[in-house]
Amino acid sequence: MQPFHPLTRRSFLTTSGVALSTVALDAILARDAGAAEKYRGLAGLPHHAPKVKRVIYLYMSGGPSHLETFDYKPGLDKLDGKPMPESFTKGQPIAQLQGTKLKVQGHLAKFAKHGKSGQWVSDFLPYHAKMVDDIAIIRSMVTDQINHDPAHTMMNTGTAISGRPSMGSWVNYGLGSECDDLPGFVVMTSFAGRNPQPISQRMWDSGFLPGRFQGVEFNSTGDPVYYLRNPKGVSAAQQRDLVDVVGELDRHRNAVAKNSEVDTRISQYEMAFKMQASVPDLMDISKEPKDVLELYGAKPGDGSFASNCLTARRLLERGVRFVQLYHRDWDHHGDLVKYMHLCCGATDRATWALLTDLKRRGMLDDTLVIWGGEFGRTPMFQGKGGPGRDHHIKGFSMWLAGGGVKGGIGYGATDELGYHAAEDVVHVRDLHATVLHLLGIDHAKFGVKYQGLDMKLTGVEPSRVVKEILA
């Protein structure tokens, strides 16, 4: 076997047939080894003083029922089992119940008022009941898309058109990251329950923004990031040399090509190398004190939503700008009670623990927490096994908490059956405008030119900051 000869940048560049002048070669080699340009956001941002500097988005994929979580409607129980009044549904978009005889499904949970604020919360969410004074519940959300994939796309990118940047990518592009050895936008999906619907990686893609701003998915079990470990027999020093050489070649090529995606590739190689050291320590939650693990109900390596919530806090501590946690088991067309117990059992305590932990550490004051799915569920019965509910876009619930958000309030309302958002309607675009505002960004001024258009997260249709929920 031939002995290993250390790879040096000069020897590689001078013997590999790359045509570089002496001046160009010396200029490249004079760069600080492996120094990828640090990105700290766009000039001129933030537009105003931010209330928060980071976001954690708890995404309940599948469409949790507002009528079994936060939206109590006594009138629904009075009409239980009776035909759904046509005045509510005539001409309205309906998913799987289209063409069937519609009947009212009463609440499948018990509701009570909780906290000093007296907010209605169902008995599926006993830990949420403990924290209602910390959250602002929006009960008048609406969206445009009634099927999962386009609805996910709408909630994440502001449009149902595929290929647009996600909200996390927009934030990462605008403000940059405070962390040098982790991505600015991290996504995790919990491992739990039955066979949930998949989530497309488009939901955290950067679209027409440079690829360096896309979300990076960390695995909840096994290796956190695939292919992050060095091949057998390759040391960290050898890997460092290789990354340096590839970066130098890319920079030389890009001096001619001037392609922004080459810069992206350079930064991705550099970030991958740094993550080889940072990610294993980050993901090892066994180092957390026993009382913290017990608070979340987290078990190291189990891939649960609880473990992901704890990991999310660790990501925020290290300066990651935007963290998105998916829990994918909320599509309850039938057996709603059974599956609500499973979903809420997996997420309720962990969500409360996350807010509690952030408060204890003084982090909630400058962190925005978002909870919700892509749409809600119908007030009408759908039967697959036990009673369930179909997709619903005309009124559902989400909540926000953290810096700049009024805790202990409910905003907006649906009608007496929970069908239409009837008061203070909040569209997905309004939610996005509000998130950007809390980060110090004016949504109307934040965009990029693409294919001759001024592209924004909030699009061209009217949108507003929901100032009524802001502290």
At which residue positions do the language-model features occur?
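Ligand-binding pockets and gating/stacking loops
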Residues: 1-471
